[in-house]
């Protein structure tokens, strides 16, 4: 049974940082993506323009890239999942 939040390990190779973050399972992946990216960059004092800088969320163990309009609960993201945030070029 899934609660309303899961704890995932977020990995940002572009800034060499990793964080464990709770995310709501009822939100769409694009919204979770933007919120996490903004929070991580703000915590590190790095300016980011979310309109210009785009990131994709990729499952580290499976290589699956999550599409934007899928609720987290409908993905394979569960407690302990490692998600790599890759900057799009």
Language model: regions and residue ranges:
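Ubiquitin system architectures
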Residues: 2-89
């Amino acid at each position: 049974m899934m609660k309303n939040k899961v704890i995932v390990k977020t990995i940002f190779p572009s800034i060499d940082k990793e964080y464990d973050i709770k995310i709501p399972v009822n939100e769409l992946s694009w919204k979770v993506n933007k919120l996490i990216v903004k929070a991580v960059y703000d915590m590190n004092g790095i300016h980011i323009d979310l309109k210009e800088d785009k990131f994709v969320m990729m499952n580290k163990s499976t290589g699956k890239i999550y599409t934007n309009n899928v609720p987290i609960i409908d993905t394979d993201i569960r407690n302990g999942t490692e998600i790599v945030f890759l900057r799009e070029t």
